[in-house]
């Protein structure tokens, strides 16, 4: 596939690493708005903005239902309407982090990313497919499945610049979602995420670079800032990795906005030099090809 079909032009992106996740939903939303406005002042040509996982509510299994919202474009909930207005105001594609979603038909709760186009239209959503259920000795014990249900599909978004895939945090540990989006022509994988301070130092950079190199796409991980006063301590270090595995932008632990330019020439030149897309042998590993 040629680069022109993957990414139509250079685009600037911004990842907003903010300390949301407070008990005050509107304060969290307003803080996101403040940071997005700042990003657009600092880099007016920004076309794509990403927010962190669970930015508008506490990241706690006993709080997800309380903060959950029904995602219905015809009757926008508080967060959906707020983020829609921001995308429209600044004419950006907005990957709105994640929010707890209530499905009124099943009463199930999902960890869901909502994606808006430049007109503020909700163009898709991604429900976290792989739930964060871990017990790390001398580390962390956390079970999203106590409250949340897993999503049932992969998500690839089509925009005027090209396609990108969306996963959420723990989803990045499973290479299949990125592979599916890449095979559909995605130029990037975007993961609103909240790794903790145990697994973050071990795997954050490794996984970001692995997903990028595996699929020769850009990878963006957007984390909350670390807040030691909250019950969950995020790793931070929001990051942008290019298709060669090179880190092109990285945040620290605190509140910060990082910027990067995605370049179709980087994708094209690396795919020509190392033509993985032409060399894969799905005739050999045919079970991977089933989708």
Swiss-Prot record:
One Gene Ontology molecular-function label: hydrolase activity, acting on carbon-nitrogen (but not peptide) bonds, in linear amides
Pfam families recorded: CN_hydrolase
Catalysed reactions listed for this entry: a monoamide of a dicarboxylate + H2O = a dicarboxylate + NH4(+)
Classification via InterPro entries: C-N_Hydrolase, C-N_Hydrolase_sf, Nit1/2_C-N_Hydrolase, UPF0012_CS
Active site per database record: 53, 128, 169
Entry keyword set: Hydrolase, Phosphoprotein
Annotated TM spans: none
Segments forming domain CN hydrolase: 11-264
PTM sites of type Phosphothreonine: 34
Gene Ontology terms: biological process: amide catabolic process; asparagine metabolic process; glutamine metabolic process; oxaloacetate metabolic process
A GO cellular component entry from the record: mitochondrion
Catalytic activity, EC: 3.5.1.3
Highest rank taxon of the organism: Eukaryota
Class in the EC hierarchy, top level: hydrolase
Family: Belongs to the carbon-nitrogen hydrolase superfamily. NIT1/NIT2 family.
Function in brief: Possesses omega-amidase activity. The role of omega-amidase is to remove potentially toxic intermediates by converting 2-oxoglutaramate and 2-oxosuccinamate to biologically useful 2-oxoglutarate and oxaloacetate, respectively.
Subunit structure and binding partners: Homodimer.
Miscellaneous: Present with 4510 molecules/cell in log phase SD medium.
Protein name as annotated: Omega-amidase NIT3
Natural source organism: Saccharomyces cerevisiae (strain ATCC 204508 / S288c)
Gene name of this polypeptide: NIT3
């Amino acid at each position: 596939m040629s680069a022109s079909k993957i990414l139509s032009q250079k685009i600037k992106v911004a990842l907003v690493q903010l300390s949301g996740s407070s008990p005050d939903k509107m304060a969290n939303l307003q803080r996101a708005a403040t940071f997005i406005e700042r990003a657009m002042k600092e880099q007016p040509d920004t076309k794509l903005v990403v927010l962190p996982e669970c930015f508008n509510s506490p990241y706690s299994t006993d709080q997800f239902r309380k903060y959950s919202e029904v995602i219905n474009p015809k009757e926008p909930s508080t967060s959906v309407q707020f983020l829609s207005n921001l995308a429209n105001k600044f004419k950006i594609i907005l990957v709105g982090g994640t929010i707890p979603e209530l499905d009124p038909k099943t009463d199930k709760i999902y960890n869901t990313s909502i994606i808006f186009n430049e007109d503020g239209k909700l163009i898709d959503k991604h429900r976290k497919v792989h739930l964060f259920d871990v017990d790390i000795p001398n580390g962390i014990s956390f079970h999203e499945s106590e409250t949340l249900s897993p999503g049932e599909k992969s998500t690839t978004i089509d925009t005027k610049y090209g396609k990108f895939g969306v996963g959420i945090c723990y989803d990045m540990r499973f290479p299949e979602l990125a592979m599916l989006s890449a095979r559909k022509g995605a130029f990037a994988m975007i993961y609103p995420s909240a790794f903790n301070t145990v697994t973050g130092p071990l795997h954050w950079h490794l996984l970001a670079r692995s997903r990028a190199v595996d699929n020769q796409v850009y990878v963006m991980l957007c984390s909350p800032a670390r807040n030691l006063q909250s019950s969950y301590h995020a790793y931070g270090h929001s990051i942008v990795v290019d298709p060669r595995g090179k880190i092109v932008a990285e945040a620290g632990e605190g509140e910060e906005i990082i910027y990067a330019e995605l370049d179709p020439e980087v994708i094209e030149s690396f795919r020509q030099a190392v033509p993985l897309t032409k060399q894969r042998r799905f005739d050999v590993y045919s079970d991977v090809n089933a989708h």
